[in-house]
């Protein structure tokens, strides 16, 4: 599961768990981005975001955290994340999971055509969200029917943008994210400067889920 995780919250965790259950995936790998290339705001230091992700996922033996994007350096592109994860798990079938609203702009991603050769795409959304992606569907004409699918996740009413805003204004973060992450945000005094609005964020993430036995 790749993304900024700034901060990670229950929406990310529930989305990963639900998709893993639906597609019978063996492992969920969370991949905090190094330097997100499409973010229009300053993100927290990569080490802070990495440690929050480790804290949030520690209690689930099915979850793990990878540093491939952080250690690579430079802007983080999904095509590179997929390439590196495939190199580490050559026998795994990869699932790339992202917010459904991000799929509308997927053709602006660097090397997006090759990404569909490396992974199946799953868009996660809040209940009732309708994805208008005719141009994406047309571009994918000729690929397998399951190359792209949608999954509704009720917990996506939670967003990283709102969590940052609440922290900036001293509002509680309890029950929006694991207790350890709440304590980390407080100890490190993260998000004390009011954040940019960030638009209508639903899930500040893209997701990579290797299914080692599903080849």
UniProtKB/Swiss-Prot annotation:
Pfam families: CTP_transf_like. It catalyses: nicotinate beta-D-ribonucleotide + ATP + H(+) = deamido-NAD(+) + diphosphate. GO terms for biological process: NAD biosynthetic process. InterPro entries: Cyt_trans-like, NadD/NMNAT, Rossmann-like_a/b/a_fold. It comes from the Bacteria. Belongs to the NadD family. This is Probable nicotinate-nucleotide adenylyltransferase.
């Amino acid at each position: 599961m790749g993304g900024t995780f700034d901060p990670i919250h229950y929406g990310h965790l529930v989305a990963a768990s639900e998709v893993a259950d639906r597609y019978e995936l063996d492992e969920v790998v969370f991949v905090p981005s190094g330097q997100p290339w499409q973010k229009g705001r300053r993100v927290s230091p990569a080490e802070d975001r990495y440690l929050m992700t480790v804290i949030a996922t520690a209690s689930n033996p099915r979850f793990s955290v990878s540093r491939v994007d952080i250690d690579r350096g430079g802007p983080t592109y999904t095509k590179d994340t997929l390439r590196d994860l495939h190199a580490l798990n050559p026998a795994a079938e990869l699932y790339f999971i992202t917010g459904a609203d991000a799929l509308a702009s997927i053709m602006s991603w660097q090397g997006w055509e090759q990404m569909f050769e490396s992974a199946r795409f799953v868009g996660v959304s809040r209940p009732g969200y309708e994805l208008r992606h005719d141009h994406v569907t047309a571009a994918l004409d000729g690929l397998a029917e399951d190359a792209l699918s949608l999954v509704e996740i009720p917990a996506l009413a939670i967003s990283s943008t709102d969590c940052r805003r609440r922290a900036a204004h001293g509002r509680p973060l309890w029950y929006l994210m694991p207790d350890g992450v709440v304590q980390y945000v407080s100890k490190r005094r993260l998000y004390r400067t009011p954040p940019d609005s960030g638009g209508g964020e639903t899930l500040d993430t893209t997701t990579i889920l290797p299914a080692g036995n599903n080849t």
